[in-house]
């Protein structure tokens, strides 16, 4: 499954939330991998190079904020868009999330009718898919 251009990594330790996000993304035609902590997310991202990483902030072994900071500092992984999906929707949380290395922020509860489109909006063109001469 490496280098699948529609692969999305969902990092969420709440099983029901993880299953819902994966279902919505798969229903929209995406391949999805899931894991439940930031350390696994870093390992999977390095191996699979997903198109987008969707990550909760509060995770067991390593928080989403810590994982995003590590991903943002890694030259081979920093270009992968990272989207925080979290129940933290207080004033200032969005700025804190973006400063930690996330590219976007979606507050929980997610809106099922628009979730997949919100995530796809973070897709960036894959350089190796462009035509010669572009």
What residues fall within each predicted segment?
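Short amphipathic alpha-helix used as the core "switch/output" element in two-component signaling
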Residues: 43, 65-78
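The feature encodes the CheY-like receiver
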Residues: 60-63, 78, 90, 108-109
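Charged docking surfaces used in two-component/phosphorelay signaling
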Residues: 19-27
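Conserved acidic carboxylate
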Residues: 12
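Active-site beta3 strand of CheY-like receiver
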Residues: 48-54, 59
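Acidic catalytic/metal-coordinating carboxylates
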Residues: 16, 37-40, 63-69
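Short hydrophobic/Thr-rich beta-strand motif most characteristic of the beta2 strand and flanking loop
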Residues: 29-36, 44, 106
């Amino acid at each position: 499954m490496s280098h699948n251009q529609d692969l999305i990594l969902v990092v969420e330790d709440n099983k029901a939330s993880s299953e819902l996000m994966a279902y919505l993304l798969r229903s929209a035609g995406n391949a999805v991998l899931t894991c439940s902590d930031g350390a696994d997310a870093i390992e999977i991202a390095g191996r699979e190079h997903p198109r987008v990483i969707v990550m909760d902030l509060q995770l067991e072994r390593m928080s989403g904020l810590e994982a995003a900071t590590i991903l943002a500092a890694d030259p081979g992984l920093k270009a992968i868009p990272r989207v925080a999906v979290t129940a933290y929707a207080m004033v200032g949380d969005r700025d804190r999330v973006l400063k930690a290395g996330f590219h976007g922020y979606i507050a929980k509860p997610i809106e099922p009718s628009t979730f997949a489109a919100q995530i796809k909006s973070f897709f960036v063109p894959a350089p190796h898919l462009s035509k010669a001469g572009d």
